[in-house]
Amino acid sequence: MSIAVFIDGTDAQQVTELKKFLKSYGAKVLDNTECSDANWPDELIKCIKFLNVCWKDESIAESDAKDVLTSVASMFIQLPPNKLIEAVPLFCEKLLDFSGDNIRRHKNKLFPLNLLFWGLNPKSHPRYEIFLTLIECAEKMGVLNEVITDPKKVASWLSECDCTVEECQKVWQKLYDAHIALGENRKAIEAMIYLLSTYNEVTAVNARQNAIKCIISVLQDPCLLSHDQLYALKPVQYLEGEPVHDFFKIFVSGDLNTFKNFLAKHPNFLSHNNLSEEACVHKLRLLTLMQLSENVNELSYHEAATQLGLKIEELEPFIIEAVRQRAVACKLDQVQKKILITGAFPRTFGRPQWINLHDTLVQWRSHLGTVQSSLSMMIQNESS
């Protein structure tokens, strides 16, 4: 794919023409001298502060503005490391200027930022600041979906760039804030969990508010049924002894009776944290059903209704909803009043579940070996 540039030519020639272009739009302090192979990096850096004409001056065609910013980004890739470290913060700071009435013109910033992020060496540390700027620009324009924000990929990039813990925390916080601003709560929770995972026993105290915020967000989401990963994080463990931790623990390993006892002691907890009692009870019933379904082939209607705190006539609609939410896979035997379990999803996934998975895989491998041996014998018999 060819990249649009301001003019064809060497980097020195491009910077010379860039200076002329910017001078024609008010950058009078730039000189008219020709750039050389020796000084073009310094001259390029001088031009950065005047790049805002690309989105402020309506007389510049949007295509020309995009070509200018793209040319600058492509030349950044050729900069020596020491000049790149100097140039990137200035460039990012300038692109974060969102002054001007025409928000559409700011969209030209995304392509050069992406070009720069992907064009630099994966281990280049300035990619960290470029990605931060990319997130903020995309969030301000409401197009965060145009930026790759998959947490696993972001974590890999941060590792490649050799970012400090503090820098990683800044990225995850920025991602969380951007997702929240755009109403993407599920993605915000994912970013927050990665943020909380960067804290240890010593620094966990600094993440107290974020930990509480994450717990409440997870509990508010009716489709999030796995809580043990968050529960194990140091900032969440730091909250032990506080009502929010006690309440969250109910959804990890508690039941409806524990829930009722908690509300008796803390009657205002739900309203203070914008939690619905009905939604919490429904989620807790789903989690209880998941736990009941582990390692069994069937459940009687009576047993299930008793454990879930439901009337018999309320059970079938609840089970159908649980299947829809993928909390359990089952069939209903309405004649014998039984729930036939065809697939169960563990409420928590700890050491017992890993051991069970290991044993199952070993058993499968053994069975496959038997099948392979039988097929080999059949082939030999047919050949003879």
UniProtKB/Swiss-Prot annotation:
It is found in: Cytoplasm. It holds the Pfam family PCI. Keywords: Cytoplasm, Initiation factor, Protein biosynthesis. Residues 184-346 form the PCI domain. One of its GO terms (molecular function) is translation initiation factor activity. GO terms for biological process: formation of cytoplasmic translation initiation complex. One of its GO terms (cellular component) is eukaryotic 48S preinitiation complex. Component of the eukaryotic translation initiation factor 3 (eIF-3) complex. Belongs to the eIF-3 subunit M family. Component of the eukaryotic translation initiation factor 3 (eIF-3) complex, which is involved in protein synthesis of a specialized repertoire of mRNAs and, together with other initiation factors, stimulates binding of mRNA and methionyl-tRNAi to the 40S ribosome. The eIF-3 complex specifically targets and initiates translation of a subset of mRNAs involved in cell proliferation. This is Eukaryotic translation initiation factor 3 subunit M. It comes from Schistosoma japonicum (Blood fluke). The lineage of its organism: Eukaryota, Metazoa, Spiralia, Lophotrochozoa, Platyhelminthes.
